[in-house]
Structure formats: C-alpha cells, structure tokens
Regions:
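Flexible low-complexity loop/turn motifs enriched in small/helix-breaking residues
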Residues: 2, 8-15, 22-134
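Short beta-strand edge/turn micro-motifs at domain boundaries
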Residues: 135-162
Length: 162
C-alpha cells in the first residue's frame, strides 16, 4: 500500500504568501495613491521684504498646504515664498496680459491689487505605481482678502501651475 504525503503545509504556506502579496499590493497600488498628500515634512522657506507680515505669510503657507493635500498619493517637500520672485512673476504676468490677453492671475491683480497677491513655489513628489515623479517649482497664487467667505487663513486661491 502506498501512502501519500499531505499537501496541507504547502497549501497553507502558499495561501499565506499570496495573502501577504495581496496586502502589499493593495497598500502600494490602492492605499498610497488615494491617501491625501503628506504635508507633514514640508520645508518652509520665507524670504520676505515687508509686503506681508509674518502672520499673513504663515496663513498663505497654511492655505497652500491645505490645498496641496488634494494631490493624493504625493508628498509636499517644500513651500517657498520669495518676495522679490513673487513681485517679478506677478508683474510679468500682468504685463503680458496688458496687451489684450487674460489670465486668472492678472484678473486677481486687477481685482485685489498687486500688493495683495502672493506667489508660492512648491516642490512635490508623487508616486504612481512603480514610477516616481517630481514637480519642483509648482506655483500657487493667492489673493489676500480676509473678509471673504472663500478665504482660507485670509487667502483666496487664485490658480496653480508653472
């Protein structure tokens, strides 16, 4: 009479390995891409000249980080405010549209005044599946209007992009 060895240990081990593989895959390809952006480790760099006070700039950074949380599966590495760069970019945007074009930023400058619009630069890292991507220098524009119902930390979101 022949006896056969039990295949139960191999089956149990196979099921355990498959379960772990499924859990790792779900974490990496389902959970990570769907979670709000991690803003907890963002480096904040401020180079201000007095246009906005410290609490206004802090409010702009908080509003920006809150908005960037919608970048699911990403990490915000840095938020920068440089008053000179902000003024230069805002003036250039307004000058370009002066000859008949339009943009949300130029419209905000007309509506709120050049002295009430701010530009923040962001570095963002994202992971899509097995690929990493980086958005360095992603811009966010806000208008200071603390009385508005749309304002977050006193700032109204205007636009974002390069």
């Amino acid at each position: 009479m022949r006896t056969t060895k039990s295949k139960k240990p191999i089956t149990v081990a196979s099921v355990c390995v498959a379960a772990v593989a499924c859990a790792v895959g779900a974490y990496r390809f389902v959970y990570l891409p769907l979670r709000p952006a991690d803003v907890s480790h963002a480096r904040i760099s401020i180079n201000a000249t007095g246009k906005f006070d410290e609490s206004q700039i802090d409010g702009a950074v908080k509003a920006d980080l809150a908005g960037l949380k919608s970048w699911n599966g990403c990490r915000v590495d840095a938020v920068r405010y440089d008053a000179k760069r902000s003024a230069t970019l805002l003036a250039a945007e307004h000058d370009v549209t002066a000859s008949g074009g339009s943009s949300s930023i130029s419209t905000a400058i007309d509506e709120y005044g050049m002295d009430n619009v701010i530009y923040l630069s962001n570095d963002i890292s994202c992971r899509a599946g097995s690929q990493n991507s980086s958005q360095d220098g992603w811009g966010s524009w806000y208008a200071w209007n603390p009385g508005s119902a749309r304002a977050e930390h006193g700032w109204i979101f205007i636009d974002e992009g390069y």
